[in-house]
């Protein structure tokens, strides 16, 4: 549902943020 989509978006954003910090 919508909540799952939102959680996926948040997880993607968090992962991208962490990856950007590390590299």
Curated annotation (Swiss-Prot):
Keywords: Amphibian defense peptide, Secreted. One of its GO terms (cellular component) is extracellular region. Expressed by the skin dorsal glands. Transmembrane segments: none annotated. This is Dahlein-4.1. One of its GO terms (biological process) is defense response. Its main location: secreted. It comes from Ranoidea dahlii. It is found in: Secreted. Has no antimicrobial activity.
